[in-house]
Amino acid sequence: MKRFETLSGCACCPVHRRRFLATGCAACAGAASLVGVGRLAHAAEKPDKTRIRVIYALHAEVQPGADWPNVGFDFRPVMARIDAALKQGCPDFEFVTSMAKTPQDAQKIIDGDQSAGVDGYLVYQMNCWNRVVQPVLATNKPTLYADFQYGGSGGYLVYTAGFLRDKRPNIGLVASSNPDDLVAAVKCFDVVKKGGTVEDFAAATARVRKSLTPGPSNMACEPDRLELLDVKDCLAAMKRAKILTVGRTFPDIVPAIVKEMGIEVEDVPYAELNAAWEAADKDKANEIADRWQKMAKTIEDVSRKTLEESAAMYLAQKEVLKKRNANAITINCLGGFYGGHIHAYPCLGFHELCNEGLIGACECDVRSTATMVAVTAMTQGRPGFISDPVIDTSKRQIIYAHCVASNRVFGPEGASNPFEILTHSEDRKGASVRSVFPVGHMTTTLEFGPERKEILFHQGKAVEAVDDDRACRSKLAAE
């Protein structure tokens, strides 16, 4: 764990992180990296200032491996901008900045703070799964938990859900792309400084968040003539369906899927899929690669060889589906690729299957695949979009993100939308899809929990096909 401490006080002090301000001097605008000062300069600050420990939860300053946002991502300028926003927006606060990768790193920081007069903590989830906020919350000090969007969002939402279920009293939440929202939440630490409780702090942050979240915009949607199967025919279609799982590692809910949804599930070894890939017709693969090159709006950092290998993987998926009389396949993609079990990413193959009214699903996510089977049957061919959600309260948006998506969202016979072929985002390898989704339509998000006999359901109006290089390639923002 690399620990850096940066005090925010006088903007001109050379040992402090520089400000990134339009009104600042040119020399100050150039500093992007964290600077370790090695001491706490108490004398430089007024004793009555509210002192906040800022902990960035991340793997490293420059990301070493495949994860959100992406391999090679440089967090240093991001952290510098956050520090600058805090300094500018909260001049009556003192910020002491550190980084932590593990709970043990966080605990060392906490132990060192025992005599440092820290009034509260701001934990910024920069990567998804670094469990840093948990030991911080255990201090019972007021803790503001913030999400670096498209970087820490997965862990942030999962951990936040647990904190809400546990009714943790000392946590405030920020999930906003607007730094002013962060500043407003940080100012709530003064509630405790002035004698309030941690519960008062948490309540104040909630009020601020709600007050800064904009109200609904025009929610009128484009017309969409959706014709659904009746219940009897939909259930019959589900019973005719079969899901193939390759490299299954998700929690075993297969018995519940079979019992409650009537969908058959069958395991397939990597070796069978890889053999079909090796045996795929090279001429057909070349034809498919030609079509992709012709139809894609953009192809970036993906070679012709990779396109042909991806086309062969699509043909392999089709062959295995045909051989086993199935209409859905879900693959533990990265586990197979990095384990040497498969040698081409299946993303473009999934894209093609979904365009055809079949189901290709990422990560051997059998729960989402079963949901897709049911809803594709019910909507008579409309594809699902497995997604990892991101919240942006400043825009009143939820952003759905993944590296596989159809570009025929209204079904195989419906209108198509533009798509781009890019690398798989987290590791910048292989080939995947950015679907430039249509906007103005009502979207419905579902997840079936057959083992609990529950369905999660919400709706939102599609308002933006987000183009951001971080995290998964296809992104759709809904309000």
Task: Please describe what each predicted stretch is.
Residues 47-52, 56, 70-81, 101, ...:
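Anaerobic metallocofactor- and corrinoid-dependent redox/one-carbon enzyme cores
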Residues 1-16:
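N-terminal secretory signal peptides
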Residues 23-24, 161-381:
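Conserved, well-structured core segments that form the ligand-binding/active-site neighborhood
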Residues 14-19, 30-44:
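N-terminal twin-arginine translocation
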Residues 44-158, 210-236, 259-325:
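Metallocofactor- and cofactor-centric catalytic cores in central/energy metabolism, strongly enriched
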Residues 62-64, 102-105, 129-132, 152-153, ...:
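Flexible loop/turn segments at secondary-structure boundaries
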